[in-house]
UniProtKB/Swiss-Prot annotation:
The record marks K486, N489, R666, K667, K721, Y755, W934 as: Interaction with DNA. Binds two Mg(2+) per subunit. The magnesium ions form salt bridges with both the protein and the DNA. Can also accept other divalent metal cations, such as Mn(2+) or Ca(2+). This is DNA topoisomerase 2. The active site is at Y803 (o-(5'-phospho-dna)-tyrosine intermediate). GO terms for molecular function: ATP binding; DNA binding; DNA topoisomerase type II (double strand cut, ATP-hydrolyzing) activity; metal ion binding. InterPro entries: DNA_Topoisomerase_II (IPR050634), HATPase_C_sf (IPR036890), Ribosomal_Su5_D2-typ_SF (IPR020568), Ribsml_uS5_D2-typ_fold_subgr (IPR014721), Topo_IIA (IPR001241), Topo_IIA-like_dom_sf (IPR013760), Topo_IIA_A/C_ab (IPR013758), Topo_IIA_A_a_sf (IPR013757).
């Protein structure tokens, strides 16, 4: 009889094994995952959010023991033995100790039901029951008041189960006993309780455990930071009860709730409220709009990550009362009303509550589900909040948005219009058969501007075929709509804004679209004026963006159009794009002529690398549709078509690319960009290419976003944005000795580098690069001549670009060494991918910008300190040591103070001096303003202070470069109440790194270390290049000298000789051939070169070349760098 090998289908687990096998059901997953958590630094000086990699269970087993200690504060309250201290200690091996005094667990077997073993009731000590057996608790009696976090009798036992060892020590002074018991092997084994006598007068409970790291993962610095946050929570909660909290023997300095909330570094106004019976306390803070700033809340000492009823108990009455005040009738805003969504993102709540018998969402207790709580918001609090400057600004901006969105019926009005194929749209040429029974066979061509329209008109007579047989031609079948202006990102726009965008409405009217219509049926498709759309964009990143915006419009509002339901449309897809080449190479061999078209830069570069480049090759760049001649249009019109197809991930990718709320996902998307990881090849020989929307987003549209960031974010190596780099390149190309008008230089740069974003942007860039007032540049890269703006208004008072001049300052070539130019990588537009400055300009001049998905704010630092640090780094590097850069921000000409204020933040202070009092009035002088506060702005602030009676008078004696305000007041004035301070952050230092990827640097040291490592490599590259260049020059010079001697000594006969004979002589005598394999450098020498003085010059040149080669041979890259630094220093 055969035996069965089938496993048992059903089984049971012990309580312990159930926790070990399925921990996520009770305590949380043991699998480490990336998530956002609050962490605290070693000094307990700041609480911040951070992405960490951690298993939830590892955190929870710590919190469960800690929560028991907090619960004991409440149990001990009002007793003869109140809790006075809680101590937490974490050893290097992960062993964790949590100790608390106060009321103790009695060392007795008389106060519990015991446990059942083999069907028999056995008495056990309270400690063994509480810490060693699941579902044991003192919290099951719901008839008594319970203001603790414990409820289910599971928490600390899970810590025991998920630990390799777990020990509990209890001292009971009343019974004069000490209890010790240790469990091992995940609570499966125990050495048994040991009870001894104790003379200690202070009772305590102490838990010592070592987590099962094999299951949970090891402690990291981030995890310890999370533990500190939970310990800090305990210190805050315990402070009101006079309980001291220690972490690793260090007492935490939290004395009240406000001390705790300050650690979140709130920069705006805040206010605190305490419920009359003391059961709850809240701090309400105004914050910059950020929907991810969740409330910070606690129930009975337990951190509730997701809030709950205690948070709602404050937020609901607060926002109800706030809106009732903000929405009072107004002549300006009439019947408009703000709603919750207009104000809630701007307030953050910090809540601490004590609740009887709390009910949570799960064992992890992230949210309070009941009881329902209602707290009281006094009217005076709402009055104060409404007077906050931030709230006033919010009120005004929110009502302005409502005013703009008042007319929400425009779409309905538009849809109610009858279908009119010959709609009046400026510059639109409708197809003759559009809107007829043959409209489904018509195609609307969408292009950019009138020059692109001309291209389309020239091309439609050629026609387009997607099958190779049925070619449609002419105006009967093709309509042409040139887009006039910027196409709206409709995914973030309300209906009013969308319909007011004429570019969108032109497309809607031309197509005959009806909002809300389902176009998945043949009948609904026939209602359109056109059956398909072809986009003809410019062949650049901006053209890709237009494609994306049009696709986004149809996907968001008319996604059913992507599904072909009309049989004829299978051969003519609904939406496609016509591509034109960006580069044409015209080969000019002796016989014949070949033209090769390239649709991507990558394909062109590959061709150049794989083919020998001939001087007769001609290159033509197509910068836009307007660069194509009329006679050339038929050759390329419709020859490369890309068909857009919907795919399963299209919605997710469209949201990622265009939706405001997906900002974090967009950042990660851009960070991971790899231009070499491509699956779509536009240079494929196929005429018709199929492209999924997801692939378009991730491989094509991302190029626009990256280019947008290049315009907005600086590069780590040269510290320049794209436009700044183009200006430096253009100025070097200009190479004029005289000053040049800003307007002239801008036009020259635009022409030289094919800058596509308007000369006005270049004018602004040039002006900013030359400005010298406080806060503009520590080292201006251009020399100003004229009025370039002052600190009066932050440079906005600059004169017109037509009237002011710039020049190349002497320092420019000391920072950007011309010797590096040959070894830099260059773009197709001509300028370097990045320059290689001798010093890190990114740290010296800083940078501010906003791009797609990213912004940056990099402070300025002292060039002298940076240079000293570079010298130290170079010297210590050669000794095998590492230098750490630690400097605080510095702004040239600033006379105030800059002080560190927590991690990643500094405060700049203006200067306020107290003069002698006069007639009961305080007299003050303001002689400096904080960074980025301009003189005119402070004058406006003083006018407001006078209206609010903070000050009495304000006399302005400031000049263009200095600040001087004389202020009198009946009150004592401070830096704080005059707002003479501003924050300088180092928490958003985003830039392109050495690999061309977007990277956020956390510290100045991180930037400097990477800059130094990359810069030293460039010096070595320069050294090798110079040696190669010098050796080649030496070889040529020595060959010239030998050639002169051989000719003069008649060893070589060249007079009346055939070329072949001369060449053979040179070959036989082993003369050096040039790069072309020729001897032209010898044979083209002028006969005057054979005169003695020229021979002497050549000999002197050879000696100089040998000296230079010797110098570069004996000098390492660090010494080269130091030499450049020493030459630069006198110009700083």
């Amino acid at each position: 009889m055969a035996t069965s090998n089938h496993k048992k289908q059903y089984t049971t687990l012990s309580d312990i094994d159930h926790v070990l096998l399925r921990p996520e059901v009770i305590i949380g997953s043991t699998v480490p995952m990336e998530q956002t958590e609050y962490v605290v630094d070693e000094n307990f000086s700041e609480i911040l959010e951070k992405q960490v990699f951690v298993s939830e269970a590892l955190i929870r087993i710590f919190v469960e023991v800690l929560a028991n200690a907090v619960d004991n504060i409440h149990r001990s309250k009002g007793s003869s033995t109140p809790c006075k201290s809680i101590k937490i200690k974490i050893e290097d091996d992960g062993t964790t100790m949590i100790h608390n005094d106060g009321q103790v667990i009695k060392i007795s077997k008389e106060e519990n039901d015991g446990i059942e073993i083999n069907g028999k009731k056995c008495s056990v000590y309270n400690h063994e029951l509480v810490f060693g057996h699941l579902r044991s608790s003192s919290n099951y009696d719901d008839t008594v008041v319970r203001q603790t976090s414990g409820k289910n009798g599971l928490g600390v036992k899970c810590t025991n189960i998920l630990s390799k060892s777990f020990k509990v020590i209890g001292v009971d002074p009343e019974n004069k006993k000490k209890f010790v018991q240790e469990w091992t092997n995940n609570m499966k084994e125990t050495s048994g309780p040991k009870v001894t006598t104790s003379s200690s007068k202070t009772g305590y409970t102490e838990v010592i455990y070592c987590p099962d790291f094999e299951r949970l993962g090891n402690f990291s610095s981030d995890i310890i930071g999370i533990f500190r946050k939970h310990v800090l929570d305990v210190a805050m909660l315990a402070s009101s009860e006079g309980v001291s909290v220690y972490f690793n023997d260090k007492k935490l300095p939290i004395k009240k709730f406000s001390d705790y909330t300050k650690l979140f570094k709130l920069e705006k106004e805040s206010i605190s409220i305490t419920e009359e019976d003391g059961s709850s306390e809240v701090t309400i803070a105004f914050v910059e709009r950020d929907g991810k700033k969740k409330p910070i809340s606690f129930v009975n000492g337990l951190f509730t990550k997701h809030g709950g009823q205690h948070v709602d108990g404050w937020t609901k009455p607060f926002f109800a009362n706030l809106l009732s005040v903000l929405n009072k009738p107004s002549k300006t805003y009439k019947d408009l009303k703000l709603s919750l969504k207009d104000v809630t993102p701007y307030f953050r709540f910090f809540v601490k509550s004590t609740v009887d018998k709390p009910q949570f969402d799960c064992q992890n207790k992230n949210m309070l589900k009941s009881p329902c709580l209602k707290y009281t918001i006094p009217d005076k609090i709402i009055t104060k909040v409404c007077k906050w400057t931030s709230v006033q600004e919010l009120k005004q901006s929110s009502f302005e948005k409502l005013l703009k969105g008042k007319d929400n019926n425009i779409i309905k009005t538009l849809n109610d219009k009858k279908r009119r194929p010959k709609v009046s749209v400026k510059e639109y040429d409708p197809a003759n058969k559009a809107g007829t029974t043959l409209s489904e066979k018509c195609t609307l061509i969408v292009c950019e501007g009138l020059s692109a329209k001309t291209y389309a008109v020239a091309g439609i007579s050629t026609g387009i075929s997607f099958t190779g047989t049925d070619t449609k031609k002419g105006r009967d079948w093709f309509g042409i709509l040139p887009l006039r202006g910027k196409f709206l990102n409709v995914r973030n726009a309300n209906n009013d804004k969308m319909i007011k965008n004429t570019v969108v409405t032109d497309l809607v009217n031309a197509m005959g679209l009806t909002f809300g219509m389902d176009y998945s049926t043949q009948k609904s498709r026939k209602s359109l004026n056109y059956g398909s759309i072809i986009i003809i964009p410019d062949p650049d990143e901006d053209g890709i963006h237009i494609e994306g915006l049009v696709l986004n419009f149809f996907h968001h509002h008319f996604s059913s159009l992507f599904n072909p339901v009309v049989p004829n449309l299978k051969d003519f897809p609904f939406i496609s794009s016509m591509k034109i080449p960006i580069i044409k190479v015209i080969e000019k061999p002796l016989k014949g002529r070949r033209e090769i078209e390239f649709f991507t830069h990558e394909a062109f570069h590959k061709f150049k690398n794989e083919n020998k480049w001939h001087k007769n090759h001609e290159i033509k760049y197509f910068k836009g549709l307007g660069t194509t001649k009329h006679e050339d249009v038929p050759k390329i019109f419709g020859k490369k078509m890309v068909v857009f197809n919907i795919d399963d991930n299209a919605h997710e990718n469209m949201e990622k690319a265009f939706k405001d709320e997906e900002a974090d996902e967009r950042k990660e998307w851009l960070k991971q960009y790899n231009p070499n990881a491509r699956t779509f090849d536009l240079d494929s020989p196929n005429k018709i290419l199929q492209l999924n929307i997801s692939t378009f987003i991730n491989e094509e549209l991302i190029k626009f976003s990256i280019e947008d960031c290049k315009r907005s974010l600086p590069h780590l190596i040269d510290g320049l944005k794209e436009s700044q780099r183009k200006v430096i390149f253009g100025l070097k190309q200009w190479n004029g000795k005289n000053n040049i008008k800003v307007a002239q230089l801008g036009a020259f740069v635009a022409q030289k580098t094919d800058y596509k974003h308007g000369e006005q942007n270049l004018f602004d860039t040039i002006i900013k690069m030359a400005q010298t007032f406080v806060g503009a540049n520590n080292i201006p890269l251009l020399e100003e001549d004229g009025q370039f703006g002052t600190r009066l208004s932050g440079g906005k008072d600059a004169a017109s670009p037509r009237y002011i001049f710039v020049n190349q300052p002497p320092i420019l070539n000391k920072i950007f060494r011309p010797e590096d130019d040959p070894i830099l990588n260059y773009t197709l537009d001509g300028e370097p991918v990045f320059y290689a400055p001798v010093i890190p300009l990114i740290c010296i001049n800083g940078s501010v910008g906003v791009g797609t998905g990213f912004s940056c704010n990099i402070p300025m630092f002292n060039p002298s300190e940076i240079i000293d640090g570079l010298k130290q780094w170079i010297n210590m590097r050669e000794q095998g040591e590492k230098y750490v850069f630690k400097y605080k921000p510095w702004y040239k000409g600033f006379t105030g103070k800059i002080e560190k204020n927590g991690s990643g933040r500094y405060i700049s202070y203006g200067t306020l001096s107290n003069e002698a009092s006069n007639n009961g009035m305080y007299q003050y002088t303001v002689s400096e303003l904080p960074i980025n506060m301009w003189t005119d702005k402070f004058k406006e602030m003083c006018d407001q202070y006078r209206e609010s009676n903070l000050i009495k008078t304000c006399d302005n004696y400031s000049e263009v470069t200095t600040v001087n305000f004389k202020i009198s007041s009946e009150h004592e004035l401070t830096i704080e109440n005059l707002k003479l301070r501003s924050y300088i952050h180092t928490s958003n230092m985003v830039m392109f790194d050495h690999e061309g990827k977007i990277h956020k640097y956390e510290t100045l040291n991180g930037i400097m270390q990477r800059f130094c490592k990359e810069r030293i490599k460039i010096y070595e590259k320069r050294r090798q290049y110079m040696l190669q260049k010098l050796n080649k020059s030496l070889t040529i010079s020595e060959n010239k000298k030998r050639f002169m001697e051989d000719v003069m000594n008649q060893k070589i006969k060249i007079l009346l000789q055939e070329d072949e004979v001369v060449h053979q002589q040179l070959l036989d005598m082993n003369y050096y051939k040039d790069d072309e394999g020729e001897f032209d450098y010898l044979l083209n020498m002028n006969i005057g070169g054979f005169r003695k003085k020229n021979v002497d010059k050549l000999i002197s040149k050879i000696d100089d070349l040998k000296k230079d080669i010797m110098w570069y041979t004996n000098t390492n890259e660090g010494q080269m760098w130091l030499k450049d630094i020493l030459e630069l220093e006198p110009f700083i």
